[in-house]
Amino acid sequence: MVPPGNGNGAAAAAGNDVILELSTPGDDWSHELQGDDVEANGGGNGDAPPRRTFSFGQAYKTRHRQPQVFTVWQTLMLGYQSLGIVYGDLGTSPLYVFPSVVLPDADATDFLGILSLIIWTLTLMSLVKYALIVLKADDHGEGGTFALYSLLRQHVNFKGNIPVPLTRLESDVHLKFHSKRRSRPSRLQLFLENSPKAQLAITIIVLIGTCMLIGDGALTPAISVLSAVQGIQSRSSHIKQKHVVVLSAVILVLLFLVQRFGTSRVSFTFSPIMLLWFASIAGIGVYNIVMHYPPVLKAVSPHYIYYYFAKNKRVGWEQLGAVILCITGAEAMFADMGHFNKSSIQVAFSTAVFPSLILAYSGQAAYLIKNPGDLSTAFYSSVPAPLFWPMFVVSTLAAIVASQSLISASYSIIRQSIALGCFPRTTVKHTSDKYEGQVYCPEINYVLMVVCVLITVGFQGGPEIGRAFGVAVIWVMLLTTTLMTVVMVVIWEVNGALAGGFFVFYLAIEGTYMTSLMTKVPQGGWVPFAITVAFLSVTLSWTYGRKKKREYEARHAVGDGEFAGIVSRSARVPGMCLFCTDLMDGVPPIVRHYAANTGSLRELLLFVTFRTLPVRTVLAGERFLVAREGARAGVYRCIAQYGYMDEQDMVGDDFVRAAVAALVEVAAAAAEADSGEEEAEMIGRAPASGVSYVIGRTVLRMRRARNWPKRFVINELYRFLQKNFRSNVSTLKLDHAKTLQVGMIYEI
């Protein structure tokens, strides 16, 4: 199987040099694929090779960005824009960190110790780990958990029986956006390639991490909006907590309901809002430091952490669950890197976000040293009275921006999960013609809305919601540390001792926080686990069902002899038929059912397999791998390759145009000259006689002899997901008038 246009492919092997040109597709099939097929070059004297011109269609203007060198001004502008997209969650954490601390009879030693913990947690976790280290592990500019995973799979051949399937092909390493493997693999790389259990463990870690991030999409809006709205209680004794909860729930419902309109119309306000927010909290922080306790910045010395734990012991350790909230949203620096670039995110964090947060927390600590009784309302109590209402408005707007960032991130995660085949197909709508990353998933939106409102109403704004949020945050941090350690050894070729030191150092920090938070599981910390288990159950049920389906089709593929009989018994009619299948080799069983029910086959048969690679995007010239299926004329195999950021569909005629162009090239170059030209002409005219799509509508049924857990997953969970999520016809945007679904029952 060769990619079209590959100089090392069948064209060279056949001794017939073929020069590919990309041209603008016309409306006439015959002109596009036949009339311009061969141009005489050099007056037909035979001195120059024939020149073939093919159109690959408009559908594959892939959404990748060419490598670009950014000027200082461009980097600064991107950094400014990142304030509203990347730093909403991290920036609004001063609303709830100190108020989440429960420390009776706190004094200056306690507040200096907590401030020192916050400063060093922000420095070591956000600045050093994420801004300086994790941001380097991008997949050609794309960040996030899936980017780390795809980067690993580009360097490690996952051959085990893992939930997310990928059969590596030799052509993969030649892709533009596929990282090159080093010639001498490390021992860790060899271990991973030969250990299916290790591969499964890494895959499960990635899936858990993504499910935790989806849970953040429900927890962040709840805690951010509640914390912002609660400030109104400090100015009116008539407003009770139940009123705050109702108002917060209304704001959250409205926030989720407007998602269908997209964020493009209001996203231009996000960065100004967050810039105003950071300037405000920094200014108020400086005011509180000067007015209440100027020496508060001495907390930068870590010995105050020792004094804090020496005094409070277990009670002090229990408050780590509140301190960890200061880095909520730090993972967004990596997850949203694809929208900006590494330098802009680093500049924004180091020049605006980090200093503002340090000043804000220091100001609150200075205020609390003089007013320890205001701990539960630390943020709003520390705001000077004349600025209260302006800050209330800015805080509420900033909380909405923070919520929007995590909600949008949840949609992106779901989209990538669907592309990798580890989540059921849901509706994914693009809400912006300009920004490809702005998508909307209606089903996920309403699930998150219900969960978010239930959390808000259930916890009533108590400390439990902070504990739940903290558990989700620290788990994501731990999973990222684990994956980064593997990346350091396998991809960066870092010395094992240095990579091990990184792992042990951050495991010690995050593990300490984890031990504190796990004691809070019965008191609200169970919520992120419940959300994760729910989404993970969907993910694993779907991938297990798809795996069993592929195994069944591979075992029951149509053999060469049987296929020859099917062709001989079937009438061949003009036109082209595309069979969509998960099989990358062999004739799928759907052909058997189709021929038995129709008694005919088109003159051009194309078995199409959609293949998602562990790369962010696949270039247009790398899209198709095509080859003849067996020795029969008019039967071909096409593998359509996509990255996890590409959109897979067959809308309009563009997919067929591109596929036919690739088939014409292979037919003309690989076969003998006479028959090759005849076959190429047949392929070129087939679409004009009609194009049809055949797709399976399969039902898996597991026999009673199998163990009941697997039977429950297949017969109940997987079947439920099949019935209630989108079908392949809707996902691929097939023309219903040209599509035939073949129903089949697979007994496994």
Curated annotation (Swiss-Prot):
Its main location: membrane. It is found in: Membrane. GO terms for molecular function: potassium ion transmembrane transporter activity. One of its GO terms (cellular component) is membrane. Residues 1-68, 135-199, 265, 341-348, 403-438, 492-497, 545-748 are cytoplasmic. The chain crosses the membrane at residues 69-91, 114-134, 200-220, 244-264, 266-286, 320-340, 349-369, 382-402, 439-459, 471-491, 498-518, 524-544. Residues 30-51 are annotated as: Disordered. The keyword Acyltransferase does not apply. One of its GO terms (biological process) is potassium ion transport. Pfam families: K_trans, K_trans_C. Keywords: Ion transport, Membrane, Potassium, Potassium transport, Transmembrane, Transmembrane helix, Transport. Residues 92-113, 221-243, 287-319, 370-381, 460-470, 519-523 are extracellular. It is a multi-pass membrane protein. PANTHER family: OSMOTIC STRESS POTASSIUM TRANSPORTER, POTASSIUM TRANSPORTER 6. Belongs to the HAK/KUP transporter (TC 2.A.72.3) family. High-affinity potassium transporter. This is Potassium transporter 6. It comes from Oryza sativa subsp. japonica. The gene is HAK6.
